[in-house]
Amino acid sequence: LAWYHGDRGAQRVTGTELLILALLLAIGGGLLWRLAAAPANVAAADAAKPLAGASTPIPDKSIAVLPLTNESGEKDQQYFSDGLSEDLITALSQFAGLKVIGRNSSFQFRDTKLPSASLGQALGVAHLLEGSVRRAGDVVRISAMLVNAADGSTLWSQHYDRPYKDLFALQDDITRSVADALKAKLLDGSGARVQSERPPSGNLEAWNAWSRGRFHDAMINPADARKAIGFYEQAISLDPRYARAYASAAVSWVTLAGTFLSGEEQRQAYVKARAASDEALRLDPDLAAGHAARGLLLQWVDFDWTGAEAEYRRAAELAPADALARFTLARMSATLGHPQQAISMLREALTIDPRNGSAWHWLGWTLAAVGQVEEAEQAARRAVTLTPTSPFIAAGLVIIQIQRGENSAALSAAQQIPADIWRSIALAFALQGGNDRAAADQAVKSLIETSADGSAYQIAEVYGLRRDPDSMFQWLDRAWDTRDTGIGRLLTDPFILRYRDDPRFAAFCKKVGLPAVTDAKAMP
């Protein structure tokens, strides 16, 4: 959303942002992190290079599960091999002291030819789990191998031929073998709860339907979103107590409603999302994905920030090894005016998901919010390296360069962004720091003419940069009228915070339900 992938843009609704956050909130699966993923040819050395001054020792008890190769020869079986890979990630995350890299980062190395040492460095792990899977009728064949990343030596390997009906037992065998090899132990009773993606009945076809739903969720279009919901409903019909499927359905309904629907159809979709979320938590009160889905509804449908924060915090408590849970809570912490706390959480999340371009972007934004602009720019550049095709990520670098006073560099970077609403927004920002006042004025005028409803919050920011508080507060009011998700950035926004002592700032915070107190700094 605004604070996750982009505020508002060319779409008539929250669009990409809502889609990203909604899919982010499928705790333990990471449905659509591929949207923020780097192309496979991004250099591993670039991704592995730490920020200046950062220490990145690789713990011995650390592992990345590379996506199992689909050897069935059928592309429509990709969901099956990916589902098995993700289930292994989830299962290994239940072991205390074992660092398990998230799906977003490890899946970027699908079919990679990079040597194991480069992979280990890029992902920050000492071990790699790789292999292949083939399903032929009622038989599943899996080859798995645990590799020492530093030298490529094999620590454990096994080939399995099992009946399809024994799939869950087979996955458990692999998990136990890897855990034994790494001398890892299951989590204790510290408040965490094993977060299984399997149906409580053990119905394989229900899990299969749920996995298909996740696959279609990744297609990013309304037809596939509806197909995903259909598969989740099929999973529920096969196991009516499948809480995880209800949570996934809730997230998909929010995604569909916020990205592709409007009017009464949108309202009804939100009703269905809320019902599915409630049922997920009724069936399993300790399901992290259920709390995350409820948080999504509270945040971006009800704009209940504190209620959403409580749900995200509970999800993170239940799934402490999940980078996505940490990331979501970190961004909500920043939304509520605690950027220093958010920075710590974002750093923790990045140890588990080091190639997450969006997380690097938000680390940069949040560092800049507390005045650490040099390190913020380094993080923003890392984000651009990892997500080179994202106009939003590129615009984030422009805004940080403006905060550093690098106006020429900011304008040059903005001009390199491909045609997109975020190019227009970046140019509107960058031109304010130059000497061509006519161009600066025209950039704001053009942004208003083309995207007044979709970019009301960004227009308010530009007026803050222009030191025009009257226009800034007028556009903030319009942003609230249109429920612009950019409002979630308010308490970490250096342009808006220039006027934090203006009585209108406290009044606006009260209206939108945010505290008027923040640790962030204003732009001078």
Predicted regions and their residues:
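C-terminal structured "cap/appendage" subdomains that terminate the fold
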Residues: 468-497
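TPR/TPR-like (Sel1-like) alpha-helical repeat modules
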Residues: 415-422, 477-484, 513
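Membrane-embedded alpha-helical segments of integral membrane proteins
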Residues: 1-15
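Sec-dependent signal peptide hydrophobic core
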Residues: 19-23
